[in-house]
A protein has these predicted regions:
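Extracytoplasmic
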Residues: 20-53, 58, 71, 235-240
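Helix-breaking motifs and short loop linkers at transmembrane-helix boundaries and internal kinks
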Residues: 50, 82, 103-109, 120, ...
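Conserved MFS/SLC helix-loop-helix module at the cytosolic interface between two early adjacent transmembrane helices
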Residues: 69-108
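Helix-to-loop junctions at the C-terminal end of transmembrane segments
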Residues: 71-83, 268-280, 368
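Paired small-residue
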Residues: 93-100, 108-117, 306-314
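C-terminal membrane-cytosol helix-exit motif in multi-pass small-molecule transporters
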Residues: 180-199, 391-394
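A late C-terminal transmembrane helix in Major Facilitator Superfamily
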Residues: 333-371
Length: 404
């Protein structure tokens, strides 16, 4: 006679939570892939829709702008909705946006599709971590959020280069169709695996958001986020044409380089988290300082394959290294100055990240049009120098607070 052990209630709950987190991670993977997929597809989109590479770059900058608006504004407007209902609507909008992109026959329609997708991105980034934290015990919340964000990391490493490969082999529309499939899988997974008894969000007024922006110390960090994170995107947005037209790599090789670049980003993100645990603002100063130097050096190494590749991978290593430190420092300042709106401060900083992407990619387009692709590197470096100066100022203010 065989025997078996009935799983405990706690074990069943843990299993359900893990499957729900997996569903959120799949959603994050799709959203992370669609955010940067255009970077690898710019040459294809430019050629097929008869627009310049600079104009094609608007698929990155306007997407980021849409996400920047979507994070604080749409999150505030939907705060009273059921979390699962909102999650399902986010995925519907995500699928529709990428579906329109997959059949777009004009650049205008493609831009509209990207903005629609971006709205879903902005809201998901704001509520995804909240849902992840709500479905696990309090002592496992950080791990749950990390699992959800694994989807973004995997998207950076594999989603973008694979999407670029699909676009090169079958056309750029096929890449967006693949993202639609991911969105449908995520929708089904969320509907089945994410519990329905989640608490509604706490309504956040625009007045509360304005209070945060009025706080000088927090506003300073939001600007640092936009400049320091966004500076790299002056170059990164046009990395594919830069690698092909300036460095001289074949399109197939660019896909592999994007994969290695994604791995460098993931490593840098983990390193940045550890470096920022003790003194985030000091760590950020050195991160931005080194990234600015790398961007300036790229101006001279980009025409050479070996030197250019080493510089570009170094750029990837530092590109997202600042993200954990910036988020942690915003939370520290919000807890100190506006303790009732810590979550809102984090959401606004997410908007600042996307605002930086929008600004950086837009400036990159202007530079590419007027000066040429290679000049995006030093211009991006100047943008990061702005973050270095403001970070030094913030360090001075921090020391003054400690003296008090």
């Amino acid at each position: 006679m065989s025997s078996y052990t009935v799983p405990s209630s706690e074990a069943q709950t843990n299993r359900r939570s893990m499957f729900a987190l997996l569903a959120l991670a799949i959603s994050a993977f799709g959203i992370g892939t669609t955010e940067f997929i255009s970077v690898g597809l710019l040459p294809s989109i430019s050629k097929d829709l008869n627009v310049s590479v600079t104009t094609a770059g608007l698929t990155v900058s306007l997407y980021a702008l849409g996400a920047a608006v979507g994070a604080p504004v749409l999150t505030a407007l939907t705060a009273s909705m059921s979390r699962k209902t909102l999650l399902m609507w986010i995925m519907v909008i995500f699928i529709i946006g990428n579906g329109i992109a997959a059949v777009a026959t004009s650049f205008t329609v493609l831009i509209i599709a990207r903005i629609v997708s971006a709205f879903a991105h902005g809201v998901f980034m704001s509520i995804g971590s909240t849902i992840a934290a709500a479905i696990v015990p309090e002592n496992k919340r950080a791990s749950a959020i990390a699992i959800m964000f694994t989807g973004l990391t995997v998207a950076t490493i594999t989603g973008v280069p694979i999407g670029t490969f699909i676009g090169q082999e079958f056309g750029w529309r096929a890449s967006f169709m693949a993202i639609v499939v991911i969105g449908i899988i995520a929708f089904i997974a969320n509907s089945i695996l994410v519990p329905s008894n989640l608490k509604n969000g706490v309504p956040v007024s625009f007045r509360d958001q304005f209070k945060l922006i009025k706080n000088g110390r927090l506003l300073l960090v939001f600007i640092i986020t936009a400049l320091g994170y966004g500076g790299t995107f002056v170059t990164f947005t046009y990395l594919s044409p830069l690698l092909q037209e300036v460095t001289g790599f074949e399109a197939s090789t660019v896909t592999i380089i994007l994969l290695v670049y994604g791995i460098a980003i993931a490593i840098g993100n983990m390193v940045g988290g550890k470096l920022s645990n003790h003194n985030p603002i000091r760590a950020l100063f050195y991160m931005f300082f080194i990234q600015a130097i790398i961007l300036f050096v790229l101006t001279f190494t980009a025409p050479f394959k070996v030197a250019g590749l080493i510089t570009i991978i170094s750029m990837g290593l530092f590109a997202f290294m600042n993200v954990p430190g910036l988020q942690v420092y915003v939370v520290i300042l919000a807890e100190r100055f506006v303790p009732s709106a810590v979550d809102v401060a984090s959401a606004i900083n997410i908007a600042a990240f996307n605002g930086g992407i929008a600004l950086g990619s837009y400036i990159g387009g202007l530079v590419t049009n007027s000066l040429g692709l290679i000049h995006t590197a030093w211009v991006g470096g100047l943008m990061v120098v702005g973050a270095v100066i403001l970070t030094a100022w913030s360090m001075t203010l921090e020391k003054r607070d400690q003296v008090k």
